[in-house]
Regions:
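Mixed-charge, low-complexity intrinsically disordered regions
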Residues: 1-81
């Protein structure tokens, strides 16, 4: 696992390792555990809103499960779609 420090960019556009694009709307907190969650929106299809825990959002792609994927991170910040 990388020691690289990554942060979520609000309103940043991210590419998922399965080649779909999302925009981060905000970071929210679980009311009981205070765990951080990333709130993000699909930039395709129904443009639905999703949440994922911040640690998982910023994690590396599982290259054992997805050996053909070249992207290092599950979600990578991009300049444009």
């Amino acid at each position: 696992m990388s020691e690289e420090k990554r942060e979520v960019k609000i309103h940043g556009i991210y590419k998922h390792f399965k080649n779909k694009y999302y925009i981060v709307e905000d970071v929210a907190y679980h009311s009981e555990t205070q765990e951080e969650y990333v709130v993000y929106r699909r930039l395709y299809g129904d443009n639905s809103l999703w949440i994922r825990d911040k640690k998982q959002f910023l994690s590396e792609t599982n290259h054992v499960k997805y050996p053909d994927v070249q992207q290092k991170w599950r979600f990578e910040l991009v300049d444009e779609v």
